[in-house]
Amino acid sequence: MKRTFQPSTLKRARVHGFRARMATKNGRQVLSRRRAKGRKRLTV
């Protein structure tokens, strides 16, 4: 059985990146919550 985590920077950015977050209303909510919490990194 293969390991399930096969990292790919491109896929990672497309799913969890800043532009992906900005594309949807809920994604923008995620960013604003992380800003309010004071996260150093908003996205990956």
Curated annotation (Swiss-Prot):
Residues 24-44 are annotated as: Disordered. One of its GO terms (cellular component) is ribosome. InterPro entries: Ribosomal_bL34, Ribosomal_bL34_CS. Residues 31-44 have a biased composition (Basic residues). One of its GO terms (molecular function) is structural constituent of ribosome. PROSITE patterns: RIBOSOMAL_L34. One of its GO terms (biological process) is translation. Keywords: Ribonucleoprotein, Ribosomal protein. HAMAP family: Ribosomal_bL34 (MF_00391). Belongs to the bacterial ribosomal protein bL34 family. This is Large ribosomal subunit protein bL34. The lineage of its organism: Bacteria, Pseudomonadati, Pseudomonadota, Gammaproteobacteria, Pseudomonadales. The gene is rpmH.
